[in-house]
Amino acid sequence: MSNVPTAVKNIIIINVLVMIMTALNENFMYEKFALFYPTSPFFHWWQPLTHMFMHGGFWHLLFNMYTLWIFGSVLERVWGAKKFLVFYFVTGLGAALIHTGVEWIQMQTWLTEAAQGSYAAQTSIHALKMTPTVGASGAIYGVLMGYAMLYPDSVLTLLFPPVSLKAKWFVLIFAAIELFTGVTGTGGGIAHFAHLGGLIFGFILIWYWKKKHTLYSRMD
């Protein structure tokens, strides 16, 4: 990893170490560092940050860290380590905010139904409070948005299916898929609105830097 930029390298190392720690004491790591709904008895104020370093399994970790290595390295070489970290954490925290906001909307509906005696709503409320969210995917989607906005016409090729498209179209397709699956509830067990949140906050931050004419300024 000698050619991997400093910030990206350190993020990958921390994620791998946290995965090892989770394997050694899964219950403790999830209860303390995964992201729970704010009214859950397991919620702690630091979880919007720490959940970004936890993953649900080896393949979840591998996909996120591989994507970070490929696209995050490009962004860090343009922006410098400090500016890349600002972008990474803003998009990751923004993803957590959007995800929790959507959960809050769901919760209001269920609370109303539960007050009317709905057992299904009561079960849904309990499940939401007890179900943690983990992963750097929100920040990773932010990184993808950042890359697509800096290099919109660069051609990317997926391994499966073997399709080549410009980066800007890839991101738009990903956004459409996440919106559809999030709204329809398909693809359960995946925080689709967190992915959308990462894309949204990535877009906003890039737009802000462009407006301030600081997009290509470095912070090392």
Q: Where would I find each of the regions flagged by the language model?
A:
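A detector for small-residue-rich transmembrane helices and their helix-helix packing motifs
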Residues: 1-220
